[in-house]
A protein has these predicted regions:
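The feature encodes the CheY-like receiver
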Residues: 26, 71, 95
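Acidic, metal-coordinating helix/loop segments flanking the phosphotransfer/catalytic sites
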Residues: 45-63
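The short loop immediately C-terminal to the conserved phospho-acceptor aspartate in CheY-like receiver
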Residues: 62, 68-69
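Short, flexible helix-to-coil linker/hinge segments that flank and couple to helix-turn-helix
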Residues: 101-108, 113-152
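Short amphipathic alpha-helix used as the core "switch/output" element in two-component signaling
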Residues: 54, 76-88
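Conserved acidic segment of CheY-like receiver
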Residues: 14-26, 30-34
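Acidic catalytic/metal-coordinating carboxylates
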Residues: 48-51, 74-77, 98
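Active-site residues of response regulator receiver
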Residues: 21, 67, 95
Length: 152
């Protein structure tokens, strides 16, 4: 099968997303935002690391959107655990911190992207699509400052 056919075959199903945030209002907003996209669907939500890991055990998830600050652990620690158990899982870190340091730490933990919560909704969707398609995404304000070895 050539690459173009395989790519279109992979896009026949919606990208299944797990939303992890300890604030219900943020989770619900992300769920609404994601479910408006024709190629994306939220298949599970979690308010903490335990619920997130349980969700991953119970169903197929393609991509996880993880808050960097959870009540029971950091989103970075959760990302490391998820990537260890599910190496093909794509992780996008969502953070209230607009910080180069946190962006670098997120990528080192195994995340494919880092987006600040203050970004416009459209930017969050762009970030989801980019990481889903195998690219790295970092909030615009961080890109210019990101060293080329940020994931090393």
């Amino acid at each position: 099968m050539n690459a173009e056919k395989e790519h279109s075959k992979n896009r026949e199903h919606k990208t299944r997303i797990l939303v992890v945030d300890d604030h219900d209002i943020v989770r619900q907003g992300l769920i609404q935002l994601v479910n408006q996209e024709p190629d994306l669907v939220v298949c599970a939500e979690a308010e903490n690391a335990g619920q997130a890991l349980d969700a991953l055990e119970k169903q197929q998830v393609d991509l996880a959107i993880v808050d960097i600050s959870l009540e029971d652990t950091s989103g970075l620690e959760l990302t490391e655990k998820m990537k260890l158990c599910y190496p093909n899982l794509i992780v996008l870190i969502l953070s209230m911190h607009d910080s180069l340091l946190y962006a670098q730490r997120s990528l080192r933990a195994g995340a494919a992207g880092y987006v600040a919560k203050h970004e416009a909704a459209e930017k969050i969707i762009v970030a989801i699509h980019q990481v889903r398609d195998g690219k790295i995404y970092v909030s615009d304000s961080k890109v210019a400052k990101m060293p080329s070895d940020a994931t090393s």
